[in-house]
Regions:
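Short loop/turn segments that flank or connect secondary-structure elements
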Residues: 1-188
Length: 188
């Protein structure tokens, strides 16, 4: 049975609502680093543009947004799993860090935890300093992450992995991570 765009959008909204109830730490972690994960490319010394790749259906959240720029690429233009035949959507905040937090992407909401599938197929959440082009103090300083944040993030990603496209993407990223480093920390 094909899911409608409206049903997909409602599913994403429910995920957003769950993740809105938890935070990695008990304070605004952006105060530790100047919100580097939101404003990284606003520093003129950086040539990379900070964009986030969206998960399938997440692009529907940005239809009416003036604060985010939504664009897409053909899946053949970048290294993505072969199962992704359609366009890959990307989003960029137009005025970081002053974006509409109510529609920030799942990757922002679950940061700094990263989904990872081990070589034997087990699902984990990991912390990986090499994953980002900037330093996150939570990872660097080995700060304790709230248990409820870990639990909800794990449950959300576990559910998202039931989508074969999401599974293939996380699996590909996990294999790339395993080739790049073994120095990531399994959180759960």
């Amino acid at each position: 049975m094909e899911i409608t765009a409206q049903e997909m959008k409602r599913s994403i909204e429910k995920i957003y609502e769950r993740l809105d109830k938890v935070t990695p730490v008990d304070f605004d972690c952006g105060t530790l680093c100047g919100e580097v994960c939101c404003v990284y490319d606003s520093d003129k010394n950086h040539t990379e543009e900070l964009v986030l790749y969206l998960l399938p259906g997440e692009e529907l959240m940005y239809d009416d947004s003036d604060e985010f720029e939504l664009y897409y690429m053909d899946s053949s233009e970048i290294k993505y799993p072969h199962s992704w035949k359609d366009s890959i959507y990307l989003v960029k905040c137009k005025n970081p860090p002053k974006c509409d937090r109510s529609i920030r992407p799942i990757q922002c909401r679950t940061f700094p935890l990263v989904p990872h599938i081990s070589k034997n197929g087990e699902f984990h959440l990991v912390l990986d300093e090499t994953e980002f082009p900037y330093v996150c103090p939570i990872i660097r300083d080995h700060m304790k992450i709230n248990d409820d944040f870990i639990k909800v993030t794990y449950e959300v990603w576990k559910m998202l992995l039931s989508n074969p496209l999401v599974y293939d993407l996380v699996d590909m990223d996990s294999r790339d991570r395993d080739k790049r480093t073994s120095n990531y920390k399994i959180v759960i």
